[in-house]
Amino acid sequence: GLRKGLEVICAFDDTTPKLTQSELAQRLDLSRAAARRYLMTLCALGYMASDGKAFWLTPKVMRLGHSYLASARLPRTVMPVLQTLTNTIGESTNLAVLEDADAVYIGRVSAPKLLSTLIEPGTRLPAHTSAAGRLLLSYLPTDDLERWLTRTPLGAYTPFTVTDKDTLRRELTKVRKQGFCVTEGQYELGLRGVAVPLLDSTGSAVGAILGAVLVGLID
């Protein structure tokens, strides 16, 4: 029950912020009765709302992410580093991890400026379009990377997004050799990202520190 309830929550995203009972049932391969049961339970708990036809998530869902951020060791350990880096470069900095097809941002220190990139904790970006995502992909063992490439479609978000898997392989090899990643215009035109790895004692990347700026704002 808990697993399926979480799957229901994850079925809602930026492309489908609202779903009907039938649409959810089809998406998760549920009966309409089961879909309704999960939806009504989540509504009763305050995690979902409905207009009688469509359903959508409420802000209460953010508490789940806040609970993770409050309890997870990695964000708490790295936040002082992000603060120092932001103070030094005058730009917002972020902490990201790799989850399935996405780079997930789990920590941020904002620069004291009016205009800044809108990457908040909980933001997910396709890993192949993100400096942090590419950096983390480059540190995957070869077999794991090949499995990732096999199962993950490389969608185009701008005219410059790399969607060819052989091209991405070459880019990732370059990133691994140089130890950092720079992207520009891969997910959003004018957005430039620079990422470096957080390595554990075995040399594996457990996260990435990212600075992202709008190119037109750089002096």
Please place each PLM-identified region on the residue numbering.
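Hydrophobic/basic alpha-helical segments enriched in Actinobacteria
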Residues: 15-21, 26, 92, 110-115, ...
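Extended hydrophobic
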Residues: 164-219
